[in-house]
Regions:
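Secretory targeting and sorting signals
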Residues: 2-33
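Boundary/entry segment of secreted carbohydrate-active catalytic domains
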Residues: 32-83
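Substrate-binding cleft of secreted/luminal carbohydrate-active enzymes
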Residues: 37-51, 263-328
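Distinct, well-ordered alpha-helical segments
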Residues: 57, 207-222, 275-284
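Acidic (Asp/Glu)-rich catalytic clusters
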Residues: 58-67, 89-108, 115, 143-153, ...
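Substrate-binding cleft of extracellular glycoside hydrolase catalytic domains
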Residues: 81-203, 314-319
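Glycoside hydrolase catalytic-domain groove-lining segments
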Residues: 90-97, 102-105, 109-111, 219-274
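Aromatic-lined carbohydrate-recognition surfaces of secreted/lumenal glycan-active proteins
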Residues: 161, 184, 188-212, 262-275, ...
């Protein structure tokens, strides 16, 4: 439709009004704060799983002298299905800790198969993964999801089948990567089917190649919410720069997560085969400060820790100084 003619005086008025509005928008834009960097990463530690360990976690924060830990991190035993279903009573205490402060995160490691550290042969593992991919074990994960919702922690970060690229656990990926991916995705869909859940599912390999390149195990963006990494100071003699730049190392992990549009995390990290190594400790904490993971949680027991473990005084000093300065 052809528009009606506008008088010159009206056009001048409209032009003036437009200029004023543009200036106002510009002024508002200039006064608006620039996007801030990602907030300081939440931190926590694995200090144990007993009910009393919730207090120990907070004591770690008091020792650091800064903000309290916001990440509570525990594991479900993988010896039998009843424990993978969430039977252990200590979950109640950790759920209560999480509910006490909406800023907190509850991170729960969940094995994918029972007899999780029984060192079963590859053929048995492959058969078990295929059973899982066909739905044989769905009911166990449905029970777990219902328990977590009933405990008031429907937003639990579920670290499912961690360190799958290694050989430690029965839920390892190497014997049948396709079945592993299908089974992992199936568990996620089963748990997401439970009403009122808001779980976040974390895919967490170990740093480096290990037994299989961990990207081969990645089950897909639709079923992964967080890309984690377990990053201990190993093997012996490998410096921090090597840990950054090795194939499937720290730098590759962050690039992978960002390429897939996922936040990243470090649910396990700490000292290991290189002993009391302040260079590693400084390197990891500097990496966190630069990259801003969603959260990081040190394994605070020997041979990994810096607070409960008294064997690493130089690394302890670095951890305390940098974490206190960071105000994590």
């Amino acid at each position: 439709m052809k528009s009606a003619a506008v008088p010159k005086s009206a056009r001048r008025g409209l032009l003036a009004l437009t200029v004023v509005l543009l200036l106002l928008v510009s002024a508002c834009t200039e006064r608006a704060p620039a996007p801030e960097p990602t907030a300081v990463s939440a931190y926590g530690a694995y200090v144990g799983y007993e009910p009393s360990d919730t207090a120990r976690l907070m004591a770690l924060g008091a020792w650091l002298g800064g903000p309290a830990p916001r990440v509570g991190h525990v594991y479900l035993p993988g010896d039998r299905w009843s424990n993978i279903e969430g039977a252990p009573g200590y979950l109640e205490s950790w759920a209560a800790w999480r509910r006490a402060d909406p800023r907190r995160m509850f991170v729960l490691n969940v094995p994918m198969l029972e007899r999780s550290e029984a060192h079963l042969p590859d053929g048995t593992v492959a058969a078990e993964l295929r059973h899982g991919a066909r739905g044989v074990y769905d009911a166990h994960f449905r029970v777990l999801a219902g328990r977590l919702v009933a405990l008031g922690v429907p937003d639990t970060v579920v670290v499912l089948g961690w360190e799958m690229n290694g050989t430690t656990y029965t839920h390892r990926c190497g014997p049948d990567p396709a079945a592993w991916r299908a089974y992992w995705a199936r568990i996620v869909r089963v748990m997401r089917s439970v009403p009122a859940q808001r779980f976040r599912f974390e895919f967490t390999p170990t740093r480096g190649r290990d037994a299989i390149p961990w990207p081969r195990c990645y089950p897909g963006d639709e079923v992964v919410d967080i890309v984690g990494m377990d990053a201990y100071d190993a093997p012996r003699g490998l410096g921090f720069s090597g840990q950054l730049d090795e194939p499937y190392g720290l730098r590759a992990h962050v690039r992978f997560a960002r390429a897939h549009g996922k936040p990243f995390s470090y649910q396990e990290w700490g000292l290991f085969e290189n002993g009391d190594n302040p260079a590693y400790m400084r390197g990891m904490l500097t990496w966190f400060a630069e990259q801003r993971p969603l959260y990081q949680s040190i394994s605070d027991y020997c041979p990994h820790g810096v607070w409960s473990c008294r064997s690493h005084p130089r690394s302890t000093a670095v951890y305390r100084a940098l974490m206190s300065a960071e105000g994590a």
